[in-house]
Amino acid sequence: GGADMLDVNMGVPLTDEPALLAEAIKLVQSLTDLPICIDSSVVEALDAGLAVYEGKALINSMTGEDDRMEAILPLVKKYNAAIIALPNDETGIPMTAPERMVIVDKIVKAVEKAGVPLEDLVIDPLAMTVGADPEAVKNTLETIHQIKEKYGLNMSIGGSNVSFGLPNRHALNSSFIAMAIAAGLTSAIMDARTPSVVEAVRASDLLIGNDAWGGNWITRFREAKNA
């Protein structure tokens, strides 16, 4: 197991979030070489965190709202960072893939206008709990497929959102991750301590051709057997 990137968020009420986030990032970087996802809804905190970060950061996140893009994209450009963007705007969260794609188109245009390379854009196609909407996962998978076909962008998603409020969440999360990878998902925010989810990711990578000749799969199997 193990994470490939760490998300750092210091959104604690009634605190100096910019100062806290900057200190947290420096502390985390003193402990690990893993890349960091700088997570805040406060623009000043993002600026403070990016200013002390050593390396190429990933910002989590911005929406398709005009004022959010106008505030955050200059920071993305200034610090040569990457950005996670969500296809929702002032009207709320679109429920269908075509509605989400309208906002994805808007985000792509804004990113290009800001001079940020599209390879630095990561779209969150929005995963909602299937416990509240039986069509939720189908809409998310269709959004992933359309983003892949139209733009070929990197994508990340909350891997456990689909199972919220339901029993046996690990089984649902593992199945969803496998389906999403097949549709074109390239990364996910997930619990790297859950063996079934990690195994679903590794197996999916092998089965869709991301793990040539099963090198990673075989290596991990041997490591587990010899542990």
Give the location of each predicted region.
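Amphipathic coiled-coil/heptad-repeat helices and related helical stalk/stem segments
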Residues: L21, R68-M69, T140, N173
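General beta-strand structural signal in soluble alpha/beta enzymes
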Residues: D7-V8, I36-S40, I59-S61, A85, ...
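Catalytic core of soluble alpha/beta enzymes
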Residues: A22-V122
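Receiver (REC) domain switch/active-site residues of two-component response regulators
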Residues: D4, G55, T186
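Catalytic alpha/beta core domains of metabolic enzymes, predominantly
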Residues: K78-K225
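Glycine- and other small-residue-rich loops at beta-strand/loop junctions that grip anionic moieties
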Residues: N9-P13, E17, P35-D39, N60-M62, ...
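Glycine-rich, proline-tolerant flexible connector loops at the mouths of alpha/beta enzymes
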Residues: G2-L34, A127-V137
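Active-site-proximal flexible loops/turns
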Residues: L14-D16, L46, D67, G131, ...
